Amino acid sequence: MSSQKSSHHKADSKMEQDNNRKAWISQPSGLNFVWGGDSRYWVIPKEPRMPAELKMVSWLEVTGSFDKIEPGKTYRIGFKISFKPDATGWDKAPVFMSAKIGKKGKTVWKRIKSVSQNFGILKGGSEPVNIPDESDGLFEILVSPTALNQDTKLQFGLYEVWTGRWKTGLLIHEAFVQEV
């Protein structure tokens, strides 16, 4: 039996409640990173409040889940990101977010244009920003009022898997879920 290490990073912690922001927060260690188990591609911090650093990938897939949702309520989802000054590959990258309720739920997609449109400013060393931003519009998902006794885990993600171009320098500080 092989004890080979996975190429991917699997979430190892739950979301924490932030009462000031009225949100649930997932630190990078609480997210799943495709290629996150290989330090050539990602550096996933063990320390709290430190961002995950993208070294280099052509397939960006960062996912998380949240199970404290209630039927009939709406939830806003986002990520807090920044870029290293030497980040590359994001100026024409079609970044998307997705969300669905339960394994069999319908996936909702949203293009996050602010990443490519503001890439020059963002990689200039700005403070971390929330995506989607105001120019993208909010990303919200409604949990069906009839979802009682069904799989109601909110699954969400951040993706750029379409161009095949190498991307570097993304810092993911957290993901967040807020009841609206």
Curated annotation (Swiss-Prot):
Q: Which organism is it from?
A: Arabidopsis thaliana
Specify the protein name: Protein PHLOEM PROTEIN 2-LIKE A9
Q: Pfam families, alphabetically? A: PP2
For region Disordered, the annotated ranges are 1-21
Which ranges are annotated Basic and acidic residues under compositional bias? Answer: 9-21
**PANTHER family per the record?**
F-BOX DOMAIN-CONTAINING PROTEIN (PTHR32278), PROTEIN PHLOEM PROTEIN 2-LIKE A9 (PTHR32278:SF2)
Gene behind the chain: PP2A9
Query: Which superkingdom, per the lineage?
Result: Eukaryota
* UniProt-recorded Gene Ontology molecular function terms: carbohydrate binding
* InterPro entries for this protein: PP2-like
